[in-house]
């Protein structure tokens, strides 16, 4: 699970350039409405499909099961399309350049797991959040030496290099030290989170810092190996800036973004979203419908 792809971190310039060509130049047959004006719900119904672009490599949000895209996001989009009376046209693309393809009207929505940032919100309509991406810590199951995030002094902590979780982890260590505590014995970074979790399982590190949703999924799949560090009430302890996960729609396509938001709201109210969260992450999460876009 390559978290930095999802939450706005930079990649190499050459990779971005190649992916932009793939997303913009090579998808002329994939796309949504080529009209110069805003895309309307009537046009989507006339087309008979909602075209959604993602990178199906981020389990459990979206990933390939044989030749089909499945996951948490896929389940939500399937319900949205059912309610709209259209087919779900899912496109699997490299993540870099995927937003450029949205601007070029090659598809209707970017339904990848996007972290909500001020920069993205200035360019696109970011839908209501569908998950929590704030940084949490995972320890080995039964490690009683870590009862809360205040017990991390002297511990080895791992995370993925060049992602916002690394920044949050460094800042939390600085907070511990500013309070007169020792702080981590070591902060190690890895090329991927699966590598970090393998090191945790093998006892080479004591904690892994990653976004909440992904950690919940890891713990659900490996309940005998890992657990999230929680407070006395059993609630996950989070550090850093609140980070929410949502999707991107073109600014001018207000009918579509309003419809998607109304569906997310409905799924929250009728319990559908909670059921899907429990299915894919093991537990339900409270999600905001306002004040979820960070300040500049």
Named regions from a protein language model:
Residues 51-59, 69-82, 134-192, 212-214:
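Bilobed "Venus flytrap"/periplasmic-binding protein-like clamshell domains
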């Amino acid at each position: 699970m390559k978290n930095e792809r999802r939450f706005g971190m930079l990649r190499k310039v050459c990779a971005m350039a190649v992916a932009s060509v793939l997303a913009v130049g090579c998808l002329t047959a994939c796309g949504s409405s080529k009209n110069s004006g805003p895309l309307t719900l009537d046009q989507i119904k006339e087309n008979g499909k909602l075209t959604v672009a993602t990178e199906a490599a981020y389990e459990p949000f979206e990933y390939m099961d044989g030749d089909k895209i499945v996951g948490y996001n896929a389940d939500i989009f399937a319900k949205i399309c059912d309610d709209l009376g259209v087919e779900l046209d899912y496109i699997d693309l490299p993540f870099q350049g995927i937003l450029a393809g949205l601007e070029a009207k090659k598809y209707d929505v970017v339904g990848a797991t996007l972290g909500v940032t001020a920069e993205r919100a200035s360019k696109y309509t970011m839908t209501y959040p569908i998950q929590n991406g704030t940084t949490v810590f995972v320890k080995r199951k039964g490690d009683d030496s870590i009862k809360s995030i205040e017990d991390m002094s002297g511990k080895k902590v791992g995370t993925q290099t060049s992602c916002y979780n690394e920044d949050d982890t460094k800042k939390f260590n600085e907070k511990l030290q500013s309070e007169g505590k020792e702080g981590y014995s070591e902060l190690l970074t890895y090329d991927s989170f699966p590598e970090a979790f393998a090191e945790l399982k093998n006892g080479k590190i004591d904690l892994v810092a990653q976004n909440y949703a992904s950690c919940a999924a890891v713990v659900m799949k490996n309940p005998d190996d890992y657990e999230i560090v929680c407070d006395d009430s059993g609630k996950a302890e989070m550090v850093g800036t609140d980070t929410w996960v949502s999707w991107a729609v073109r600014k001018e396509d207000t009918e579509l973004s309003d419809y998607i938001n109304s569906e997310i709201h409905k799924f929250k109210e009728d319990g559908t979203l909670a059921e899907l969260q429990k299915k894919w992450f093991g537990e339900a999460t409270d999600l905001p419908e306002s004040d979820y876009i960070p300040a500049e």
